[in-house]
């Protein structure tokens, strides 16, 4: 029920075709299936008429929206939603970094309603670990994306997900992640410990990390993020911003 709410969640797709080595979703939910663009826009219009002023586009793999349809894309959907009367804010749920390339950013930066908040999944700040995870980017590519967003959207909040204790993660690899998290200076992050998902390649690896090591690493990253979050929020002390009440 959305009674007395100002924010609504719009599911725009289901499924995933990424096959990260730790994730069961592609096996459980199947390949990418995008909703018809006109259907999504019509739902947003109806919600706007009911008084909702903020929408969040969600899905299993939001970045892949439209790729199976061939006649639209995530950026096109965003810009069409931007034109709907009554909608004041548009957000996206977690998104893959390589979607937010220069072409995407150049198209959507004209939006008057897209919030200055991008939750860009990192998982690890170590290239060797990312490769074992079957993530399709490097830390250098990720940082380039983040810097591009911060240039196009001043004072944007970049948040992320960080997994510690992935199978085979050495002390050296973890330190690379810790240093990268400091460098990226995230506004916030969801830090979590790797857990096995039966049926995934990562779960079959023999080099699982002991629970006590994962817990120690998690606490270290959480502490780093705590400082970067405080630093980000301190920028806005003394400034005035528009808010939505519900």
Question: What do the PLM-derived regions correspond to, one by one?
Answer:
Residues 73-74, 108-109, 177, 206-209:
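Short, hinge-like loop/turn segments at secondary-structure boundaries
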Residues 86, 186, 201-205, 209, ...:
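Conserved N-terminal phosphate-binding loop of PLP-dependent enzymes in the Aspartate aminotransferase
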Residues 169, 183-186:
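Contiguous mid-protein beta-loop-alpha structural module that forms a pocket-lining wall or clamp
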Residues 49-171:
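Conserved SAM/AdoMet-binding glycine-rich loop
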Residues 120, 161, 181, 189, ...:
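Hydrophobic, well-ordered secondary-structure elements that form the walls
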Residues 1-65, 103, 108, 118, ...:
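Proteins enriched for Cys/Gly/acidic motifs involved in redox and nucleic-acid/cofactor modification
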């Amino acid at each position: 029920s959305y009674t007395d709410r100002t924010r609504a969640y719009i599911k725009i797709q289901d499924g995933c075709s990424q096959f990260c080595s730790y994730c069961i979703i592609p096996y459980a939910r199947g390949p990418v299936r995008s909703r018809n663009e006109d259907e999504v826009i019509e739902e947003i219009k109806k919600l706007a008429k009911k008084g909702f002023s903020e929408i969040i586009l969600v899905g299993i793999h939001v970045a892949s929206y439209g790729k199976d349809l061939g006649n639209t894309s995530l950026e096109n959907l965003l810009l069409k939603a931007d034109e709907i009367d009554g909608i004041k804010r548009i957000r996206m749920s977690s998104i893959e970094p390589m979607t937010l390339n220069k072409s995407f950013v150049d198209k959507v930066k004209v939006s008057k309603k897209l919030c200055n908040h991008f939750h860009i999944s990192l998982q690890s700040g170590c290239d060797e670990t990312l490769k074992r995870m079957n993530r399709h980017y490097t830390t250098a590519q990720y940082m380039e994306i983040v810097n591009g967003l911060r240039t196009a959207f001043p004072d944007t909040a970049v948040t992320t997900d960080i997994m510690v204790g992935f199978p085979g993660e050495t002390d050296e690899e973890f330190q690379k992640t810790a240093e990268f998290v400091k460098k990226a200076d995230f506004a916030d992050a969801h830090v979590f410990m790797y857990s096995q998902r039966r049926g995934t390649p990562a779960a079959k690896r023999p080099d699982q990390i002991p629970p006590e090591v994962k817990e120690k690493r998690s606490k270290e990253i959480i502490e780093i993020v705590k400082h970067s979050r405080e630093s980000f929020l301190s920028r806005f002390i003394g400034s005035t911003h528009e808010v939505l009440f519900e």
